[in-house]
């Protein structure tokens, strides 16, 4: 039996767990983590700076990173982009997430996204995914995502589905929690 999953914002003290997470995700071929493998500690520092609007990739809004953890292990990562711009509206959406490859199919992404809806979101956001990603489509459906449209993303050469995702019923916290 697994210990309970804790969902929270990323911290610098997560660096040892993040190194292990990055190594596994990079080895599995996740492009973001293939880059992060070169210096995971610096990558984590950059992610934390993104929450304050610092060192952002061009066109990206401030972005807070959240982890789903089991003890000292990161099971999933979620990035919440704050605010609207052409990137969030046209292809990026407000939310991006990945699950540790060895923990896929266990409901971890669903848990982290549901936690975000209950504890962080204060207004609806856009969430998008490659329409060939059946697991992500199931996670978004389970979270109550309302289908908006489908667009071709030339850079990734795939069709992206866009959904509206609302906060869960009940009190929400600050969007920067």
Model regions and ranges:
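GNAT-family acyltransferases
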Residues: 1-94, 98, 119, 154-177
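Conserved GNAT acetyl-CoA-binding A-motif
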Residues: 120-131
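Conserved acetyl-CoA-binding loop-helix of GNAT-fold acetyltransferases
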Residues: 96-99, 105-118, 137-142
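Alpha-helix N-capping/helix-start residues
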Residues: 12, 110, 131-134
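Conserved active-site alpha-helix within GNAT-family acetyltransferase domains
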Residues: 132-149
């Amino acid at each position: 039996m697994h210990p309970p999953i804790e969902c929270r914002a990323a911290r610098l003290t997560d660096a040892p767990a993040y190194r292990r997470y990055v190594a596994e995700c990079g080895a599995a071929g996740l492009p973001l983590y293939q880059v992060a493998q070169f210096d995971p500690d610096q990558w984590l520092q950059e992610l934390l700076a993104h929450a304050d609007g610092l060192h952002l990739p061009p066109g990206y809004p401030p972005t807070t990173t959240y982890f789903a953890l089991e003890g000292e292990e990161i099971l999933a990562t979620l990035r919440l982009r704050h605010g609207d711009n052409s990137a969030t509206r046209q292809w990026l959406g407000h939310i991006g997430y990945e699950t540790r490859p060895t923990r896929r199919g266990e409901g971890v992404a669903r848990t982290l996204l549901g936690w975000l809806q209950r504890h962080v979101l204060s207004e609806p956001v856009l969430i998008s995914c490659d329409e060939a990603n059946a697991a992500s489509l199931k996670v978004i459906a389970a979270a109550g995502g309302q289908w908006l449209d489908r667009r071709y993303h030339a850079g990734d050469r795939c069709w992206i589905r866009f959904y509206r995702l609302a906060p869960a019923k009940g009190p929400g916290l600050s969007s920067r929690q």
